[in-house]
Every structure is written in structure tokens, then in C-alpha cells.
Amino acid sequence: NDSSQIAIPILGTVRGGPLRFAQEEWLGQELVPLEETVGGEYFYLEVIGDSMTGARIYPSDLVYVKRCSMVNSGTIAVVLVNDEANLKRVFFKGSTMVLHSENPKYEDMVFSAQEIEAKDIQIIGEVLHSKIRFK
């Protein structure tokens, strides 16, 4: 057992495509260097869908997520939209939030300050990196 690594859970799946529910379910775990787990709560999600292929995130890849409720504009994040988990690049333009797919076949999703305040939109975490899985 290598004490310089820690097991991080794969909690479920996240859509990198059309809006659909992503179930939180234990899918296993991956080892991560201990220094990548400092100062926060971390988890992996398995990507389903092709909306983030332009960012080199493909179906079956694992995204490593740091749980947080805010991200900087331009960050790739896991965002709940009406209880459905989505993997998108997040932009803030004035009082609106834009969820952008890195695949031209998907349109941006734009949300008003009112929709965000109503808690229909919630940032779950920032994607720190992805891990290729060949399935």
C-alpha cells in the first residue's frame, strides 16, 4: 500500500451531452497522489455523452472534481440544472450564467439571475483534470 496515494471514490456519472439525470452511485475508486487532495472534498464522475470532446473529455473518461459552489468564468464544472448533473464550461456574462458545451452540435444554455437565485442552478464542483478510460 503506497502511503503517497489515496483512494478517491467514483460517485456516479455526469452527462457531457443533453440534459439527463446523473445518478450518484458508487462505481469504484481511483488512486490519486495525496498532494492532489489537500484542502477540500474530491471525487470522480464518469462522463456520458460527447458535448465536451472539444476539451478532450470523452465518453467513459473520469473527471476529477473538487467540490465547490462557485467557479471562475471559463472553468469546466459540474453543474446541477433542475437536479440533473451536467459537465460544461461555465461563463458569467453580467447577471447571467452560460453553460457552454465544447462541441458545436450543442447550443449554450443561458440562465438568468432569477433562475440561479431560485436554486434551479447549482455549481457542484470544478473539474481539475480528466482521466482517459478505454472501455
Q: Which positions does each model-derived feature cover?
A:
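Hydrophobic beta-strand signal
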Residues: Y64-V65, V78
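Flexible glycine-/small-residue-rich
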Residues: G12-V14, V81, S101
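Short, Lys/Arg- and Gly-enriched loop/turn segments at beta-strand edges
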Residues: V71-V78
